[in-house]
Amino acid sequence: IISVKNYQLQSAIDDIKNLVHKNTIILPLLNGIVAKDILQDAFKDNQVLYGLAIKIDAVKIGNKITQTNSAIIQFGDANNKEMSEGVLAVKNLLNDAKINNQVFEDMIKTVWTKWMLNIGLNQVSAISAATYGVIKNTPELLTLVDKAMKEVMNVSQVCDINLGDRNWQSVQDVISTL
């Protein structure tokens, strides 16, 4: 599992290069849409899965971190209509460790859908200094969130990912729970 910030990815690759063997399966849990490709370029002979974590709602106040939900790792190959041996091995490992996980048939759309949510909420939160709760209850900020997410949907069309209404609605469902 690679779980670092995107700007730390190259350093993490350098750190693990001598630890990765021919049967190592790599599972990145970074936000965004490029980590899998970067890792696959670095480890050409290894299976690198798509991955992300959701329902991470940790809040830090002072020196205390509170997590109220159980996070879920979503992962898999690009297409998981039939799970590969590697995906099944990782699923069994996570299940044995009692780590919540899901494998979706189309992991590329799953990663892009989370990226759409992050682009919408995180960017608007950064420029407005508003919490997600404030954003949810401020129509002007929600309009900005929607515009940012629509831009991701447009980019997805150009990249032949084709996020659609179902992806949009799943993100709206998440926003409504904030």
Predicted segments with their positions:
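Short secondary-structure capping/turn micro-motifs that flank functional sites
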Residues: 57, 110-111, 172-173
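Structured helix-beta-strand junction loops
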Residues: 22-23, 97, 178
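Hydrophobic alpha-helical segments typical of transmembrane helices
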Residues: 35, 86, 170-171
